[in-house]
Amino acid sequence: MRRVLSTGGAALVIALAARPGVARAQDHCGERAPAAGFLVSAEWLTSHRDDPGLVVLEAERTRAPYDSAHVAGARLIAVEEYTTRHGEILTELPPVEQLRARFESLGIGDTGRIVLYGETLAVTRLFFTLDYLGLGDRVSVLNGGLAAWTAAGGEVGTAPPPPAERKTLTVHPRPEVLADAAWVNAHRKQRGVLLLDARTREEFDGTKAEEGVARPGHIPGAVQLDWTTMLTDGRFREEGELSRLFTAAGATAGKEIVTYCRVGSRASALYFAARLLGYRVRLYDGSMNEWAGKRELPVVRRR
């Protein structure tokens, strides 16, 4: 798995907090939600380390990077704690109560900021999970990850902190940020919907086999936008650059974006970037793992 936004073991940091005075865009419920403020600097994190209720989590697929070095006081959360398998579908959201209980055990309550860093796709998938739970207005990304943190003089540790004080967390699930196969099939031909495929060109074309994808190719009408193009030199691109990439793929202010990939992991990076830019966006969690397994649904393969 590619690690970005990192040197020395940590990739990407998300700080759950909205900054006042930033540009805003409509969210799915018609309320005002932050379109900027998702990206912050190491200096910003340094100046907020003592904020009441601040929780720092490292999101990883294995424990090794955390044990090697982590932001002092950070707690480890594994991808398997916020994803689950449903039958043949490899990566799905666990039950809401399971997620809520786990986050409460990590010291997350209804106030305070949460900082996430770790392997890039582990972090963007966690961003999506928290956004689904209604915490999106508290989310930001510290560009540069642990490398930026240490360069700014931030304290690094190797031992885990004491157990967190359990908090009470109120969640407000947002089904409008999710898409399933039925929704995608019903809306994929609509002019106001843009399907973005986060996989490589070879996977999109169907010339490269993928584990768990019964029929190689892509969903008809989808546009390929490799998730790695969101990044440069270990950081998310500037908003202007991201905007140009999305515009070139067909995104406009009036369209709803649906991201997908193989199992819903790489799609979360496009989901994060779309949220950063203020687009209405859904993530098709089952992605090609589910879609290609439904023989009644069409798949385009370039030969």
PLM region spans:
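Positively charged n-region of N-terminal signal peptides that target proteins for export
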Residues: 1-4
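A mid-sequence, solvent-exposed acidic-amphipathic segment
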Residues: 189, 195-236, 245
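Flexible, polar/low-complexity N-terminal or interdomain linker segments that lie immediately upstream
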Residues: 14, 23-64, 143-212, 299
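Bacterial N-terminal signal peptides
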Residues: 8-19
